[in-house]
Amino acid sequence: MTQLTAGKPAPLGASFDGKGVNFTLFSAHAERVELCVFDREGNEYRYDLPAREGDIWHGYLEDGKPGLRYGFRVHGPWQPEYGLRFNPAKLLIDPCALRVDGDVKDDPLFLDGEQQPDPRDSAAIAPRSVVVSDVYDWEGDSSPDIPWGNTVIYEAHVKGLTYLHPAIPKEIRGTYKALGHPVMIAYLKHLGITSLELLPIWHFASEPRLQRLGLTNYWGYNPLAMFALDPRYASHPERARDEFRDAVKALHQAGIEVILDVVLNHSAELDLDGPTLSLRGIDNRSYYWIREDGDYHNWTGCGNTLNLSHPAVAEYAHACLKYWVETFHIDGFRFDLASVMGRTPAFSQQAPLLEAIKNCPVLSRVKLIAEPWDIGEGGYQVGNFPPPFAEWNDHYRDATRRFWLEKSLSLGEFAGRFSASSDVFKRQGRKPFSTVNLVTAHDGFTLRDCVCFNQKHNEANGEENRDGTNNNHSFNHGIEGLGGSQDVIERRRASVHALLTTLLLSQGTPMLLAGDEHGHSQHGNNNAYCQDNPLTWLDWEQANSGLTHFTAALIQLRQRIPALTADTWWEEGDGNVRWLNKDAQPLSAQEWQNGMPCLQILLSDNWLITFNATQDVVEIVLPDGEWRAIPPFAGEDNPVVVAVWHGPAHGVCVFQR
């Protein structure tokens, strides 16, 4: 192979120009950077990157081509007390690699020393970065650009959603291809989903601890290479990018957006006892938040925390997000532990990455959803993200469960959550869509498990049931587990209907966990991050089709009610909402605070939702007018006309006049 010439300092990563490959790498503290390329036999050839502009090291390989496998060895001081941990014995993944080949094994070759750098060479087992030529025919594809007011999000796992679907060809189940299969798209359209939110598909690794237990990181919240698509959901690693883009294109043609759950808060290098794979060896002090003793600030609970207030790291993350929008036509992002994005180290709305996203013409137009917390001091930031971010609303999740399952919530608090949590989000010109309402998510009980289990049952995770939250706000209706008498089963069914009705008819952006609409259970496991097995895969042959139709009818109903699709906050007397007691009278101050958990909500003056969260049948007098119960609470051709509703325990109904 030829020697390197200087090349250019941009863009970051490996760029093929038709004749050769330009390589660039950021490192502020390195003293020397070697590019390591590998031939088909695995032989390694090393070249010093010959040029440096500021903190960008770069070089051009004239005969480099797509498919070339490479990595870096970075030389510099070993001063762990200052956060400097350079060790050229470790082959490092390009942080901007567009493809990575190989998995991270539980192997001591990846580990480094405490006082001295570990001299063992990791190249024999290290994953390889791969040069990619990015050509794809989008055939005029464009984003469905669903208005926030009409958005219904469906949170799903690529494999778990499709792996057991009997109508999808067996050879593509559990893959990107399956997402774009006509059967899956038809199902999402029938359900009324506008936006498919996928759990992480950036190339990720399984933690060594899980590997020793014979488990894997199923969810994917352990990123290895943030520009690289994970190949495990492809028919072949080389086809992953096109197969995923084919799926995005097919979903777009059906009017469905694709949102990615992304992890910009930590990396798969974990704590100082974890593997050295990329960022730690490239520039540990720049990429991570470092304590005064040289260890990591662990505000993520995963061992390390990315320092997104560092200008170069913020630009790296910004470029990554832009890349996914421009190259894969992604319609939005959900940011895991998003408070890290605003740390300076205290949380600030003006943090570099948040400012870059807000001012970016590419990113500011896509959907942006923050998980507004991390585990560090000051990490809980619900309601504090700037526009245009929406946020997961755990207030809503807990309040809705408490109202229906624990009977421990005032009507005032319930109404506040039902009306887009205006006390939390009505600021800085934000709209009602800013709250992403959820009752369940990948993290926690499924909806069915919320009504079947009082306690978590996470023994299969290998931590003696210590992992996962104990604060579930669930109710098993008298017996722990999925079994029970017919009475128990009926009360659980009513509670599920009530929770779904509340979720899908509240103001704000609803998010539905895949499988909740057909009764999926994880048998009480509320932290199934490492369960790549039938516990998490949706069982389509056992799906509760009645519950699926109920959910689809609710979503269809939601889209018909102006008060739920408009981007305006509800105000007293504006005709959007009226709050009534069981006698059709305005709720009194006493009832708001201490009234029985029973109320009527009149939306857009024509739709009436009646809620009875008591244990008894309650006679509810409807307001004046001719009210008809409507689907999914009555047949389309045989609506029930009533003036008084005898609300069963845990009961809900919707009427139209």
From Swiss-Prot:
Family: Belongs to the glycosyl hydrolase 13 family.
Superkingdom in the source lineage: Bacteria
Pathway: Glycan degradation; glycogen degradation
EC number of this enzyme: 3.2.1.196
A Pfam family the protein falls into: Alpha-amylase
One Gene Ontology biological process: glycogen catabolic process
PANTHER family (alphabetical): GLYCOGEN DEBRANCHING ENZYME
Catalytic activity: Hydrolysis of (1->6)-alpha-D-glucosidic linkages to branches with degrees of polymerization of three or four glucose residues in limit dextrin
Keyword terms: Carbohydrate metabolism, Glycogen metabolism, Glycosidase, Hydrolase
Keyword Hydrolase: yes
Protein's job: Removes maltotriose and maltotetraose chains that are attached by 1,6-alpha-linkage to the limit dextrin main chain, generating a debranched limit dextrin.
Lineage, uppermost ranks: Bacteria, Pseudomonadati, Pseudomonadota, Gammaproteobacteria, Enterobacterales
Site (Transition state stabilizer): 443
GO molecular function, one term: glycogen debranching enzyme activity
Protein name per its UniProtKB record: Glycogen debranching enzyme
Enzyme class: hydrolase
Catalytic machinery residues: 336 (nucleophile), 371 (proton donor)
Stretches for region Disordered: 460-479
Gene3D superfamilies hit by this protein: Glycosidases, Golgi alpha-mannosidase II, Immunoglobulins
Hydrolase keyword on record: yes
